[in-house]
């Protein structure tokens, strides 16, 4: 997944949609969770955006992270839910992708390294010689930042682990660790907590080994040449979501936040530098 090469191939996985169709807002999201969960999260938000914009809103499923980048570049997508690293890739690929809002939590996001509850590991160093699972190769919290902090701690994943595997999604990583398929996994803190809260993983079989320092992560990004009036309406719609209103609470709960806040390109400079340091992006 290095150097953005797969992004150029990702259009093969996108539906055959007309480019730059401004009669329908085409929305997508990086597939960091199961397709069923992504559709469930988007349904009430999509209905809300339709009312606020006065135009149809369509969710476009994709098969992998690079497909969202190529979709935005090819004007087949208008609004995308990105992790920080995939946003950086989209901005480099298009030159004008604009992040408009993020969840309040995304200004201070973390990744978790998890292990089976009975693992003898006490530090990251104890994982040397073991197997580890990341999420998608393009995931910020499921690959880039965990890899970056492993390297900062003197651990080279390709040299120091017995096996490096990619589960494809945060929930899959947790399941792999819970089942003992791998000795450790790195994933998004928000998804990990959701899995625990919903009892989709057994808290008695898994524990957190290490938590990364904070970083900027997810955001909603628009293609740079989208009608400015639509962009402003979108931004206003997200910022108007109020957790105290019952009709908004469901939307925000599914997005795992209580509030959206404005964001900007500059917030993701540290993500870009981390990707370069980890060898996942060229200068």
Description of each model-found segment:
Residues 70-126:
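Acidic, polar ligand-binding/catalytic clefts
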Residues 119, 130-229:
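Pocket-lining segment of extracytoplasmic ligand-binding domains
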Residues 21-86:
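Extracytoplasmic small-molecule ligand-binding "clamshell" domains
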Residues 1-4:
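Positively charged n-region of N-terminal signal peptides that target proteins for export
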Residues 22-28, 33-44, 217, 221-283:
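An extracytoplasmic/periplasmic, membrane-proximal ligand-sensing/linker region
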Residues 66-80, 93-94, 125, 169-190:
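Short helices/loops that flank or line small-molecule/ion binding pockets
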Residues 6-16:
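Bacterial N-terminal signal peptides
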Residues 32-35, 105, 114-120, 135-142:
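Short coil/turn segments
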């Amino acid at each position: 997944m290095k150097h953005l090469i797969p992004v150029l191939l990702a259009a093969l996985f996108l539906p055959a949609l007309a480019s730059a169709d401004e009669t329908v807002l085409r929305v997508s999201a990086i597939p960091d969770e199961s397709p069923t969960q992504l559709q469930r999260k988007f349904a009430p938000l999509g209905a809300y955006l339709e009312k606020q914009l006065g135009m149809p809103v369509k969710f476009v499923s994709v098969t992998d992270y690079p497909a969202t980048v190529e979709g935005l570049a090819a004007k087949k997508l208008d609004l995308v839910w990105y992790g920080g690293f995939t946003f950086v890739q989209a901005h480099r690929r298009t030159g004008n992708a604009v992040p408009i809002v993020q969840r309040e939590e995304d200004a201070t996001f973390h990744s978790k390294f998890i292990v089976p509850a009975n693992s003898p590991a006490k530090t990251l160093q104890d994982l040397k010689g073991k197997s580890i699972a990341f999420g998608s190769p393009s995931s910020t919290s499921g690959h880039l930042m965990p890899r970056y902090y492993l390297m900062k701690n003197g651990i080279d994943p390709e040299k120091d682990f017995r096996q490096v595997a990619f589960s494809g999604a945060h929930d899959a990583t947790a399941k792999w660790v819970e089942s003992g398929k791998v000795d450790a996994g790195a994933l998004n803190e928000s998804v990990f907590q959701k899995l625990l809260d919903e009892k989709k993983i057994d808290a008695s079989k898994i524990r957190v080994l290490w938590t990364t320092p904070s970083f900027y992560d997810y955001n909603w990004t628009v293609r740079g040449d989208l009608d400015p009036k639509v962009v402003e309406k979108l931004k206003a719609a997200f910022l108007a979501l109020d957790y105290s209103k019952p009709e908004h609470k469901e939307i925000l709960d599914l997005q795992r936040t209580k509030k959206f806040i404005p964001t900007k390109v500059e917030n993701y400079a540290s993500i870009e530098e981390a990707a370069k340091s980890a060898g996942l992006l060229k200068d």
